[in-house]
């Protein structure tokens, strides 16, 4: 059992690359004017995501719509991919999530200091701060700014990993209890089904939360 759990985190690079590229297959670019139902659902989903993520932005901020929509769909589909039997979710790896969070966060910081230099610096010192607390507050606000990409990546990794491990442990318990009593396996099976449904919701919610936080960071900067 311990070997199975450790194998969950020890994934070959080739397998990870295939898992990352898989969402592109599920969302093909339509090459004709008359679309089918799948393309219609895809377009409706894109419009819904755009409406939710870009409601706080002005006209200038709308230029980030393609990136935010792509980010949401990519994370959501890779999270759902990990729920399939004998599959792997790239977002369960902290390195993958950091590789998304750090460049996006860096871009928001650069934009902020380029276009809103005074406002970006003002965020490091809240208005009305007592004089003797100014050095400490600046250090605290700077640290809170620098750990943003880490919190983004850790939040996504922790939620996806915890759900997968919980389902794995519950499923293993169901197989172990199978030889004890039939009623026990029934209760455990129902528990696994409920956990899977909850994990479906978590997979989609975490994709939305990740993209929403990036959108909020962009709103502060752009």
Curated annotation (Swiss-Prot):
One of its GO terms (cellular component) is mitochondrial inner membrane. It catalyses: H(+)(in) = H(+)(out). Its main location: mitochondrion. It comes from the Eukaryota. Keywords: ATP synthesis, CF(0), Extinct organism protein, Hydrogen ion transport, Ion transport, Membrane, Mitochondrion, Mitochondrion inner membrane, Transmembrane, Transmembrane helix, Transport. Pfam families: ATP-synt_A. InterPro entries: ATP_synth_F0_asu (IPR000568), ATP_synth_F0_asu_AS (IPR023011), ATP_synth_F0_asu_bact/mt (IPR045083), F0_ATP_A_sf (IPR035908). The chain crosses the membrane at residues 7-27, 64-84, 93-113, 132-152, 160-180, 185-205. It is found in: Mitochondrion inner membrane. It is a multi-pass membrane protein. GO terms for molecular function: proton channel activity; proton-transporting ATP synthase activity, rotational mechanism. One of its GO terms (biological process) is proton motive force-driven ATP synthesis. Subunit a, of the mitochondrial membrane ATP synthase complex (F(1)F(0) ATP synthase or Complex V) that produces ATP from ADP in the presence of a proton gradient across the membrane which is generated by electron transport complexes of the respiratory chain. ATP synthase complex consist of a soluble F(1) head domain - the catalytic core - and a membrane F(1) domain - the membrane proton channel. These two domains are linked by a central stalk rotating inside the F(1) region and a stationary peripheral stalk. Belongs to the ATPase A chain family. PANTHER family: ATP SYNTHASE SUBUNIT A (PTHR11410:SF0). Component of the ATP synthase complex composed at least of ATP5F1A/subunit alpha, ATP5F1B/subunit beta, ATP5MC1/subunit c (homooctomer), MT-ATP6/subunit a, MT-ATP8/subunit 8, ATP5ME/subunit e, ATP5MF/subunit f, ATP5MG/subunit g, ATP5MK/subunit k, ATP5MJ/subunit j, ATP5F1C/subunit gamma, ATP5F1D/subunit delta, ATP5F1E/subunit epsilon, ATP5PF/subunit F6, ATP5PB/subunit b, ATP5PD/subunit d, ATP5PO/subunit OSCP. This is ATP synthase F(0) complex subunit a. It comes from Mammuthus primigenius. The gene is MT-ATP6.
């Amino acid at each position: 059992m311990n070997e199975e759990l450790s194998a969950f985190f020890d994934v070959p690079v080739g397998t990870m690359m295939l898992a990352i590229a898989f969402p592109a297959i599920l969302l093909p670019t339509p090459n004709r004017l008359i679309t089918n139902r799948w393309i219609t659902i895809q377009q409706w989903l894109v419009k819904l995501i755009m409406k939710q993520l870009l409601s706080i932005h002005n006209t200038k901020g709308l230029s980030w719509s393609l990136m935010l929509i792509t980010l949401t769909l990519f994370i959501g589909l890779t999270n759902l991919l990990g729920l399939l039997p004998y599959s792997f979710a790239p977002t369960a790896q902290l390195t993958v999530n950091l590789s998304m969070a750090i460049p996006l966060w860096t871009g928001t910081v650069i934009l902020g200091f380029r276009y809103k230099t005074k406002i970006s610096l003002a965020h490091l010192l809240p208005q009305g701060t007592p004089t003797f607390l100014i050095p400490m507050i600046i250090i605290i606000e700077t640290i809170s700014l620098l750990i943003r990409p880490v919190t983004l990546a850790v939040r996504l990794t922790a939620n996806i990993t915890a759900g997968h491990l919980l389902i794995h442990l519950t499923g293993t318990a169901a197989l172990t209890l199978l030889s004890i009593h039939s009623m026990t396996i029934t209760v455990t099976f129902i528990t696994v089904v409920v956990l899977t449904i909850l994990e479906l919701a978590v997979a989609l919610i975490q994709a939305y939360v990740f993209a929403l936080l990036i959108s909020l960071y962009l709103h502060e900067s752009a």
